[in-house]
Amino acid sequence: MKITSFQVDAFTDRLFGGNPAAVVLLPEYPGDDLLKSIASENNLPETAFVVPDGQYFRLRWFTPDIEMDLCGHATLASAHIIFSQTGYMRDTIKFRTVSGELIVKRCSEGYEMEFPLREGLKSELPKEIFDALSIKPKEVYKSRDYLLIYDKQE
């Protein structure tokens, strides 16, 4: 299997700025062990693996250690590579991911991304987290992660 890989610095217009991600274009997904090995070898915060799937692209993200369920900068990097390196002519890319459909549009200012909403529900922190905070939050919400609301920024 031929593997084509790129390194992209997302969220910047200058070399060595932004947030780095590897983008690997594949005709199909190999086993997870190979994906993990490639990500580990890249040794970047994220490696995105992109596979064409009809009108969509399937997308998965790995750190050097684990698979992630969502990664904004590696999604942006993947869209940039598809738009700039593959001859893709449409102005919209639809990615299929474990987090749902992600859309990246080419626009005059660069790219625009649409991600699924992860609405948080009012919640309480686990005691060990709450006890570890020096400043207690006014409100707590939980979706995949916790969101803490404070009266003022400190």
Located regions from the model:
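Active-site proximal loop and beta-alpha junction motif in alpha/beta enzyme cores
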Residues: 1-70, 76-154
